[in-house]
Amino acid sequence: GTNVQAYNADTVFKDEQNTFTKAQLASTQTADATGSVTLDFDTYQNFILTFTGNVTLAAPSTEASQVGQTGVIIIKQDGTGSRTLSLHGDYETPSAGGVGTISTAANAVDIIPYCVLENNRIMLGSVQIAFG
């Protein structure tokens, strides 16, 4: 037998251009972060991390299937502040010196845009600092 799906005007097809009449929301991970943190690019597109200690972004989870994915990593300092960020080698920055300076004031908010270029290569844009 053959299964036939009834026509539904609200069905989205991956191989056709689609027009959305409502906002489309990317999945966002919101979490407290300290120590080694692994970002899951298969599940989430955006990340909101409240630093409760110094953070190292570890090798990310399975980004090979996410080539072309873009999003943001939002860093929020907790009420103490002075938290730092370091990166695994899969994360590449505009300068060889790493992610650059992030805000360290208590409750500061920074945004880092990213793009998955290929497996094991996530390009980070310049840090946009001190929102608020």
Across the structure, where does each feature detected by a protein language model lie?
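Fibrous stalk/shaft segments of extracellular and virion attachment machinery
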Residues: G1-A26
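Acidic, glycine/polar-enriched metal-coordinating patches/loops
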Residues: G1-Y7, T50-G132
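Alpha-helical interaction segments
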Residues: A9-T11, V37, T104
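Residues that act as N-cap/strand-start positions at coil-to-secondary-structure junctions
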Residues: V12, A31-A33, A108
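Flexible, charged surface loops at secondary-structure boundaries
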Residues: F13-K14, L39-T43, A64-Q66
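Residues at the loop-to-beta-strand transition
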Residues: N18, Q24, Q29, G53-V55, ...
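Extracellular beta-solenoid/beta-roll
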Residues: T21-Y44
